[in-house]
């Protein structure tokens, strides 16, 4: 029976329940820019990088600021906000699952669209940074999700073949990235409005409390047989 060698996690909305915070921050930033971004358009940026989001917004709303200026303003605002937080809670059941994975000797990585500074800040404030063998961002990979680049780079960094990785995601962009990388993908369904866009997931859960490493390994093995 083939078993997984690594588990790679998206960060926002998966490891940490930070998506509502990011959405609130972005709404404040959009207000400062004087633009009215619909919920549908805003939702389409889930899992994507700031470069992707601001390139689209600049084109859509004919903004005068350059993409680099928009990103710089965004990252300063986010960094200031998160620095003022004492701690950030991990999602329910996460610490137990990370412990199981670590004890079993599997590699662990993060593949996120957040900037390196924000990613390290949040993971440290959440108290889980030490679990991971690699933290990889889309800015390092060169392309935003739904491109598979960040997942392929994460697998390379931890020395594991893509097909031997399990991914945890929560967005359509992230799911597309993981599947395009040839990885088994479990999706945490946190937004009922995008459930149809998550139909390509190998497995759906509501919370980490529903899953164990043993169950993950079984699902991975069954998927290999079916494929």
Language model feature labels by segment:
Residues 29-61, 67:
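Alpha-helical substrate-recognition element adjacent to the catalytic core
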Residues 36, 107, 184:
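Residue-level detector of anion-binding/catalytic polar loops
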Residues 22, 26-30, 50-57, 71-82, ...:
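Hydrophobic alpha-helical core bundles mediating ligand binding, dimerization, or RNAP-core interactions
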Residues 1-43, 193:
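Active-site neighborhood of HAD-like aspartate-dependent phosphohydrolases
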Residues 35-37, 63, 128, 159-160:
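Helix N-cap/coil-helix junction residues
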Residues 58-96, 104:
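Metal-dependent phosphoesterase signature
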Residues 1-6, 99-102, 115-227:
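Asp-based, Mg2+/Mn2+-dependent phosphohydrolase catalytic module
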């Amino acid at each position: 029976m083939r078993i997984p060698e690594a588990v790679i996690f998206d960060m926002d909305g998966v490891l940490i329940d930070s998506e509502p915070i990011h959405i609130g921050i972005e709404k404040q930033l959009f207000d400062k820019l004087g633009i009215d971004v619909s919920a549908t358009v805003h939702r389409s940026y889930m899992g994507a990088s700031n470069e992707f989001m601001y390139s689209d917004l600049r084109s859509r709303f004919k903004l005068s600021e350059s993409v680099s200026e928009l990103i710089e303003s965004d990252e300063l605002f986010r960094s200031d906000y998160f620095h003022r937080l004492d701690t950030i809670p991990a999602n329910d059941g996460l610490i137990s699952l990370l412990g199981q994975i670590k004890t079993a000797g599997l590699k662990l990585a993060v593949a996120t669209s957040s900037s390196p500074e924000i990613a390290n800040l949040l993971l440290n404030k959440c108290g889980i940074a030490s679990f991971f063998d690699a933290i990889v961002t889309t800015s390092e990979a060169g392309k935003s999700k739904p491109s598979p680049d960040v997942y392929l780079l994460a697998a390379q960094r931890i020395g594991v073949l893509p097909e031997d990785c399990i991914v945890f995601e929560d967005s359509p962009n992230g799911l597309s990235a993981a599947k395009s990388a040839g990885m088994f993908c479990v999706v945490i369904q946190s937004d009922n409005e995008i459930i149809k866009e998550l139909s390509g997931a190998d497995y759906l859960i509501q919370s980490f409390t529903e899953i164990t490493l043993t169950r993950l390994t079984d699902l991975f093995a069954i998927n290999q047989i079916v494929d």
